[in-house]
Regions:
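Boundary/entry segment of secreted carbohydrate-active catalytic domains
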Residues: 1-35
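Conserved, mostly hydrophobic/aromatic
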Residues: 8, 36, 87, 139, ...
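Active-site beta-loop-alpha junctions enriched in small/polar residues
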Residues: 10-13, 49-51, 89-93, 141-146, ...
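Aromatic-lined substrate-binding rim segments of carbohydrate-active enzymes
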Residues: 28-95, 103-104, 156-183, 228-237
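Glycine-enriched alpha-helix->loop->beta-strand junction motifs that scaffold or abut catalytic
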Residues: 40, 205-212, 238-241
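Hydrophobic residues within beta-strands of alpha/beta enzymes
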Residues: 44, 137-139, 212, 242
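Active-site cleft segment of glycoside hydrolase catalytic domains centered on the general acid/base Glu
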Residues: 65-69, 96-209, 221-233
Length: 242
């Protein structure tokens, strides 16, 4: 690995600002981005949801990270000198191992339509984000994909469909800018069996990517020794940076 990336997720930055949030460093009020820079943060993670509003137009909250909000935050932090890890969820709200709900607009789509929708959504939105001046330095295709994405069609163990959907996102990213590295991200970072099984199945079917991402919450995901073992094993086994 060429360098250590130190980052944090600021997807709720503007929503918190609108609510009057203030940030302090040793008791002194400061701009959050200045604080991050002084503590050597170099990358900001931003999520992108498809349509984070109810049928009546009420925002779901938690940052309401549609395209416009993501561009606004992305420009703000890019102008401050940070790189952006852009995280496509392919859902209208949180996508995680317990729920990978298809966007409302895609709810009746079959496999082929979902594959095309992932490609089109990724291509259009990534193009607009970069054209707006956001400094995208890495792209995460999906979020915590341990149990798949776009359920039920893309739910584990249906790795054929999982690969179709993730590959569509990767191809769209490469079409926009082939030099931006791609991350594939699971949860349960201490579970080596999960990572070996999932990535073995995906790599047999998948497009090339550069990084494996791991979520690790110690109260859920095992010991630090288990995390260390898993990271060392999958880095060597799959020849990927983490």
């Amino acid at each position: 690995m060429s360098r250590f990336i130190k980052g944090m997720d600021l997807s709720t930055l503007l929503e918190l600002e609108r609510c009057g949030a203030k940030y302090y460093d040793h008791g002194k009020e400061r701009d959050i981005l200045d604080i991050m820079r002084d503590y050597d943060v170099d990358t900001i993670r931003l999520r992108l949801w498809n349509d984070p509003y109810s049928e009546t137009g009420e925002p779901y909250g938690a940052g309401c990270n549609d395209l416009a909000e993501t561009i606004a935050i992305g420009k703000k932090v890019s102008d401050a000198g940070f790189g952006i890890l852009l995280n496509f969820h392919y859902s209208d709200f949180w996508a995680d191992p317990g729920k990978q709900i298809k966007p409302k607009a895609w709810k009746d789509f079959g496999v082929d339509e979902l594959e095309q929708a992932v490609y089109d959504f990724t291509l259009e939105n990534l193009t607009r984000i970069i054209e707006a001046g956001v400094n995208v330095t890495m792209i995460q295709v999906g979020n915590e994909l341990s149990n798949g994405l776009l359920w039920p069609e893309g739910k584990v163990p249906n790795y054929d469909n999982i690969a179709k959907f993730v590959n569509a996102g990767i191809r769209a990213c490469r079409k926009v800018n082939a030099d931006i590295p791609i991350m594939i991200h699971l949860d349960n970072g201490g579970n080596n069996e999960l990572y070996v099984r999932w990535f073995t199945n995906f790599i047999e079917r998948g497009e090339e990517f550069e990084y494996i991402g791991l979520s690790y919450y110690p109260f859920w995901h095992g010991s630090l020794d288990q995390l260390e073992f898993n990271m060392n094993d999958i880095a060597k086994r799959f020849n990927k940076d983490l």
